[in-house]
A protein has these predicted regions:
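A nucleotide- and high-energy phosphate-metabolite-utilizing enzyme signature
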Residues: 1-215
Length: 215
């Protein structure tokens, strides 16, 4: 919480705040990882936008000069396990099928994976759709996979929103989790497709950013 300018932790000179963000990049874990991700998605809405651009440029310079830093940042895509488990479970639905946490299984890996690849290629865009378009334009991401990721992300977000609203109506704690057995046949197929794209994207990131050799 308190990610706002009235919090001293989120304001400072270009040099001072730049040093703070540099520290987040050098130790991307826990709160540092979360803060760095928030910063990389930030965009100016008032004041001197160039100040934000200067700090972000310095971070990108540091990151792209050290592959290990980008890899450590990207490792968070595996924080909640693999999409393969959810995907395989959907292939053989039974009476004991677990709920699917859409954020952990697909939304976060797509958003953070694209964020990480954008950092590696110094893509200045801050939205996932814009980053995918820029990465495809640069040849850093195949257009078909980029399209699948974007479509999958939109589908997962819609499904999670609908599930959350249904929980609200029933007076339950909102989780946004989905019971695959309550989905239509088409929705299950689309969910399988989305998680399949996530699985392939994570494999690509592991290979491209050498995540398996990061200590």
């Amino acid at each position: 919480g308190r990610i706002m300018l009235n919090n001293p932790e989120w304001r400072g000179t270009v040099t001072g705040f730049g040093d703070k963000v540099r520290g987040w990049l050098l130790q991307p874990q826990g709160e540092s990882l979360m803060y760095l991700a928030i910063f990389m998605d930030a965009h100016a809405v008032a004041g001197k936008a160039q100040l934000l651009a200067e700090v972000r440029q310095r971070v990108m310079q540091l990151a792209t000069d050290n592959d290990a830093l980008v890899a450590r940042f990207a490792m968070a895509i595996d924080a909640f396990g693999g999409a393969a488990g959810w995907w395989n479970r959907l292939l053989s639905l039974g009476g004991d099928a677990d709920l699917v946490n859409l954020k952990k299984a697909g939304i976060f890996p797509i958003v953070h994976g694209v964020r990480s690849l954008a950092l590696a290629h110094r893509v200045a865009e801050t939205g996932t759709a814009e980053r995918i378009a820029a990465l495809v334009a640069e040849g850093a991401l195949d257009a078909p996979l980029g399209g699948e990721l974007l479509e999958g992300l939109h589908f997962l977000m819609r499904l999670r929103l609908r599930a959350g609203l249904a929980e609200l109506e029933l007076g339950r704690t909102v989780t946004g989790n989905v019971d695959p057995e309550r989905l239509s046949s088409l929705e299950r197929d689309l969910l399988k497709d989305a998680l399949s794209a996530v699985k392939r994207f994570k494999a690509l990131l592991h290979q491209r950013l050498r995540l398996d050799v990061v200590a």
